[in-house]
């Protein structure tokens, strides 16, 4: 069975990677789908995020990375995929995730959203926290893959130029 794990991934963190590995133990194929979230201002472009995720996941099989502009359910219908994977960190995630899952179900009735509970050791990590700490010169190497730590450094240097 095929599933899609959609998100902003701005940038991908070890929390995301954990969800991806666990989803791969449940599903035969997983598409990590980089999407635009109009509620968020992103540091990396969609293509930069896609490339970074591909680098980070290069050793894993059964996973593909793609980008999508527009409505998520359109992508799912086009590719014949009926399962969405999302991660839940804390009760604060629940309200938004519930709203999105119900809205997507209204738009595509065959769709099921599967929630994986974040692992305890990663549950405090978010892309926004990573960006904030990196911006002020803090060490984020325990929260993101090495490729991401390097990309963050580069991006911040670019910003200072
Ligand atoms: P979006 O803008 O779509 O919420 P994110 O990249 O912030 O995109 O998150 C994508 C998904 O990954 C969401 O379901 C989110 O709850 C989940 N997620 C984010 N960080 C973690 C983490 N540290 N552990 C587990 N799941 C996470």
Curated annotation (Swiss-Prot):
<keyword id="KW-0460">Magnesium</keyword>
<feature type="binding site">
    <location>
        <begin position="8"/>
        <end position="9"/>
    </location>
    <ligand>
        <name>ATP</name>
    </ligand>
</feature>
<feature type="binding site">
    <location>
        <begin position="122"/>
        <end position="128"/>
    </location>
    <ligand>
        <name>ATP</name>
    </ligand>
</feature>
<keyword id="KW-0547">Nucleotide-binding</keyword>
<feature type="binding site">
    <location>
        <position position="16"/>
    </location>
    <ligand>
        <name>ATP</name>
    </ligand>
</feature>
<dbReference type="Pfam" id="PF01467">
    <property type="entry name" value="CTP_transf_like"/>
</dbReference>
<feature type="binding site">
    <location>
        <position position="40"/>
    </location>
    <ligand>
        <name>substrate</name>
    </ligand>
</feature>
<feature type="binding site">
    <location>
        <position position="8"/>
    </location>
    <ligand>
        <name>substrate</name>
    </ligand>
</feature>
<dbReference type="InterPro" id="IPR001980">
    <property type="entry name" value="PPAT"/>
</dbReference>
<keyword id="KW-0548">Nucleotidyltransferase</keyword>
<dbReference type="GO" id="GO:0004595">
    <property type="term" value="F:pantetheine-phosphate adenylyltransferase activity"/>
</dbReference>
<keyword id="KW-0808">Transferase</keyword>
<feature type="binding site">
    <location>
        <position position="86"/>
    </location>
    <ligand>
        <name>substrate</name>
    </ligand>
</feature>
<keyword id="KW-0963">Cytoplasm</keyword>
<comment type="function">
    <text>Reversibly transfers an adenylyl group from ATP to 4'-phosphopantetheine, yielding dephospho-CoA (dPCoA) and pyrophosphate.</text>
</comment>
<dbReference type="InterPro" id="IPR014729">
    <property type="entry name" value="Rossmann-like_a/b/a_fold"/>
</dbReference>
<feature type="binding site">
    <location>
        <begin position="87"/>
        <end position="89"/>
    </location>
    <ligand>
        <name>ATP</name>
    </ligand>
</feature>
<comment type="pathway">
    <text>Cofactor biosynthesis; coenzyme A biosynthesis; CoA from (R)-pantothenate: step 4/5.</text>
</comment>
<feature type="binding site">
    <location>
        <position position="97"/>
    </location>
    <ligand>
        <name>ATP</name>
    </ligand>
</feature>
<dbReference type="GO" id="GO:0005524">
    <property type="term" value="F:ATP binding"/>
</dbReference>
<dbReference type="InterPro" id="IPR004821">
    <property type="entry name" value="Cyt_trans-like"/>
</dbReference>
<feature type="site" description="Transition state stabilizer">
    <location>
        <position position="16"/>
    </location>
</feature>
<keyword id="KW-0173">Coenzyme A biosynthesis</keyword>
<dbReference type="GO" id="GO:0005737">
    <property type="term" value="C:cytoplasm"/>
</dbReference>
<dbReference type="GO" id="GO:0015937">
    <property type="term" value="P:coenzyme A biosynthetic process"/>
</dbReference>
<keyword id="KW-0067">ATP-binding</keyword>
<comment type="similarity">
    <text>Belongs to the bacterial CoaD family.</text>
</comment>
<comment type="subunit">
    <text>Homohexamer.</text>
</comment>
<feature type="binding site">
    <location>
        <position position="72"/>
    </location>
    <ligand>
        <name>substrate</name>
    </ligand>
</feature>
<protein>
    <recommendedName>
        <fullName>Phosphopantetheine adenylyltransferase</fullName>
        <ecNumber>2.7.7.3</ecNumber>
    </recommendedName>
</protein>
């Amino acid at each position: 069975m095929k599933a899609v794990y959609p998100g902003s991934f701005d940038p991908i963190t070890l929390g995301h990677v954990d969800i991806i590995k666990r989803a791969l133990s449940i599903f035969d194929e997983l598409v990590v789908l980089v999407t635009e979230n109009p509620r968020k201002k992103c540091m990396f472009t969609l293509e930069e995020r896609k490339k970074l995720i591909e680098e980070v996941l290069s050793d894993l099989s059964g996973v593909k990375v793609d980008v999508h502009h527009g409505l998520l359910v359109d992508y799912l219908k086009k590719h014949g995929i009926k399962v969405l994977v999302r991660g839940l960190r804390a009760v604060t995630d629940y309200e938004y995730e519930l709203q999105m899952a119900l809205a997507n179900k209204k738009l595509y009735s065959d769709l099921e959203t599967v929630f994986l509970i974040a692992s305890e050791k990663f549950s405090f990590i978010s892309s926004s926290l990573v960006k904030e700490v990196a911006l002020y010169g803090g060490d984020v190497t325990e929260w993101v893959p090495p490729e991401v730590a390097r990309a963050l450094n580069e991006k911040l240097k670019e910003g200072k130029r």
